[in-house]
């Protein structure tokens, strides 16, 4: 390929990357609220609390299953000092998280010695699947886990080929160990995503390579990082659990093999890659949407098959990453097949995202002309998919929260109750003006006395709301509760097909109202 033509294609690829980034930025600016839910909103509410406490991992928060150490609050929290608008904080913070994630891939790609970076960057920004859009492109929730994995493996490969005796490389080794400790300190997740699969991978290479001495250094590096991660995890289980409110993984149990779980995981990966089921085969979504899935699926399959057949042609570090990808998949598959751990298809994304370096390795080692054409086709499909998704007719399912937030502000109501599914979402959409305690419904009772210790401030369990109060419920929740069946409707501030909003002069009136017997 001529030099001028190569430059032209490179510029074109970078233009595609900039275009993909701008399309995403525009979509987030105008429509990100349509993608939000309680889980994603909880991240921003937590980040605001971090900025308020001036502590990156505050003890006054009720965490979920992971202690948030190296997580999105490190990006979002400082923005609260610079920007007053929660919507803009969401947009800017998400774009920064994505930029850091793509930068971490650049470090991995540099050490893998693979090209096609702008094409792979476009793939990162492509609305590949509903799961990827939700927790990466719009929520940025999984960007820390992906970033840590890319940084860790990239650093492994760098130190493998460079002398640790040099001062610069000793600093990089220290960075790797601190990163591993911080990742383990958050909980078990990153051990399963990164450190255990990589240790298995290098162990296999060390055992089965005829020149196993060359892998000994990598084994030592992997062991060092794994030990640091395990020490972090030990601190998490032995000390952090006594200081922080975090859900314990001890509730997970071993179970018998289940074909249902196997089918569930396989379908989850297909969904992660963009496969669209339950659509008409000959519809635009069925044909074009699944055509893009087929391109991704076949390219990944070709990459694995090519690496298997032409092992000698590939750099050893590239083969290492190919096997690591498979080891991650096996570890996750075993986790869901033989335990009762809760499953959502999005939990597979930290594994699925490794298709990007896998595809880059394929393009680097096969026929350049063919791979350049394939890279071009991949980029075009990514851009068309992005344009189609970002410009589709959009119905915002959260629009009513804006209306209710305005009503609450007009009535000077800023603290009160809802279930988890509405509480933090209302806080974010109201630009932080509404602080909402979330509690559970048990039998037919709204349990305001038992505030749920999950993704909210601990102080919510220690004090009651002040001033005028409200209760926000969905129609379905209303149908479950005893107090909503009363004939008295004077406390209803807002009612629609989806929500009912009750208003009260103070907490005492609220508590009395929901505890009164039926009339």
Regions found by a protein language model. Name each.
Residues 65, 69, 112-160, 341-355, ...:
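Membrane-interface micro-motifs in multi-pass membrane enzymes
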Residues 66, 410-447:
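Short periplasmic/luminal acceptor-recognition loop of GT-C membrane glycosyltransferases, typified by
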Residues 7, 19, 92-116, 151-155, ...:
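Transmembrane-helix motifs of polytopic, lipid-linked glycan transferases
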Residues 141-148, 192-193, 287-298, 319-367:
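Hydrophobic/aromatic-rich transmembrane helices and adjacent perimembrane loops
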Residues 3-19, 168-178, 223-227, 292-295, ...:
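Signature aromatic-anchored transmembrane alpha helix within multi-pass, membrane-resident enzymes
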Residues 433-519:
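Luminal/periplasmic acceptor-recognition loop/helix of membrane-associated glycosyltransferases
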Residues 170-189, 197-199:
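Membrane-interface alpha helices of multi-pass inner-membrane proteins
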Residues 29-38, 51-77, 87-88:
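Membrane-proximal lumenal/periplasmic loop motifs of glycosylation machinery
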């Amino acid at each position: 390929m001529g030099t001028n033509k190569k430059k032209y294609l490179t510029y074109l690829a970078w233009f595609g990357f900039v275009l993909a980034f701008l399309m995403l930025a525009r979509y987030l600016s105008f429509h990100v609220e349509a993608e939000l839910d309680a889980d994603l909103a909880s991240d921003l509410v937590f980040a605001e609390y971090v900025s308020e406490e001036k502590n990156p991992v505050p003890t006054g928060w009720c965490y979920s299953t992971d202690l948030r150490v190296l997580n999105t609050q490190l990006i979002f929290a400082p923005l609260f000092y610079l920007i007053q608008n929660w919507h803009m904080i969401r947009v800017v913070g998400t774009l920064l998280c994505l930029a850091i994630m793509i930068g971490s891939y650049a470090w991995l790609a540099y050490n893998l010695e693979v090209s096609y970076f702008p094409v792979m960057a476009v793939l990162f920004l492509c609305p590949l699947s509903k799961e990827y859009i939700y927790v990466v492109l719009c929520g940025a929730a999984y960007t820390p886990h992906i970033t840590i994995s890319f940084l860790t493996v990239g650093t492994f490969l760098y130190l493998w080929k460079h002398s640790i005796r040099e001062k610069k490389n000793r600093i990089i080794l220290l960075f790797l160990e601190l990163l591993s400790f911080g990742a383990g300190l958050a909980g078990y997740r990153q051990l399963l995503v990164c450190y255990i699969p990589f240790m298995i991978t290098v162990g296999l290479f060390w055992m089965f390579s005829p020149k196993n001495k060359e892998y000994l250094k990598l084994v030592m590096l992997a062991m060092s990082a794994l030990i640091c991660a395990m020490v972090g995890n030990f601190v998490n289980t032995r000390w952090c659990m006594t200081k922080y409110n975090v859900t314990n993984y001890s509730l997970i149990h071993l179970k018998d093999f289940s074909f249902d779980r196997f089918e569930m995981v396989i379908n989850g990966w297909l969904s992660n890659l963009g496969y669209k089921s339950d659509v008409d085969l000959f519809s635009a979504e069925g044909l074009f949407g699944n055509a893009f899935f087929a391109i991704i699926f076949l390219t990944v399959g070709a990459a694995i098959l090519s690496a298997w057949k032409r092992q000698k042609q590939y750099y050893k570090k590239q083969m290492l990453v190919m096997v690591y990808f498979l080891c991650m998949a096996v570890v996750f598959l075993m986790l869901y097949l033989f335990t009762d751990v809760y499953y959502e298809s999005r939990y597979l994304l930290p594994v699925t995202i490794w298709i990007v370096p896998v595809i880059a390795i394929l393009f680097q080692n096969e026929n350049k002309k063919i791979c350049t054409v394939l890279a071009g086709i991949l980029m075009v499909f990514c851009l068309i998919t992005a344009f189609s998704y970002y410009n589709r007719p959009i119905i915002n399912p959260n629009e009513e929260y804006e209306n209710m937030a305005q009503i609450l502000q007009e009535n000077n109501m800023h603290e009160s109750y809802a279930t988890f599914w509405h509480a933090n979402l209302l806080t974010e959409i109201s630009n932080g003006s509404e602080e909402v305690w979330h509690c559970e419904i048990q039998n037919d009772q709204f349990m305001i006395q038992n505030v749920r210790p999950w993704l909210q401030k601990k102080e919510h369990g220690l004090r009651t709301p002040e001033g005028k109060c409200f209760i926000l419920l969905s129609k379905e929740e209303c149908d479950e509760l005893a107090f909503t069946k009363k004939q008295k409707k004077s406390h209803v501030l807002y009612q629609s097909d989806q929500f009912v909003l009750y208003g009260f002069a103070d907490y005492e009136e609220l508590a009395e109202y929901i505890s009164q017997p039926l009339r």
